């Protein structure tokens, strides 16, 4: 094999490798957006989501929350849905993950390019009527690092 064709082969291999890595790079470089700022990029289309809640389990009747992180892809569908925090520890993590997985988003007017973003959602369970107590529980599930709007 001569030098010219060897260089061409190396260039083609490098180009193919870069093309395969592009979606992964885009995902890892997606902007981190807090739940309070998500409406600047994406609008939730389905405000009601069904979830199967088990009849029994650990701390199922206690007030609590689950923080679930995910990336909203360019198609408005959550990807890489991950349970990040459960307060108090309970068996509601799978319920929260299924809820977030079923969200669907449409781009905001500012996001006409359908820019993917990383965000999270706090799924509350059995919250008390008192506003201060509710806020205390929700605050325990906030995740750091999502303040870059």
Q: Where is each model-derived feature located?
A:
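Bacterial N-terminal signal peptides that target proteins for export
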Residues: 2-13
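Sec/Tat signal peptide C-region and signal peptidase I cleavage site
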Residues: 22-26
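A short acidic/small-residue loop/turn micro-motif
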Residues: 55-56, 85-91
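Short, ordered coil/turn segments that flank beta-strands lining enzyme active or ligand-binding pockets
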Residues: 74
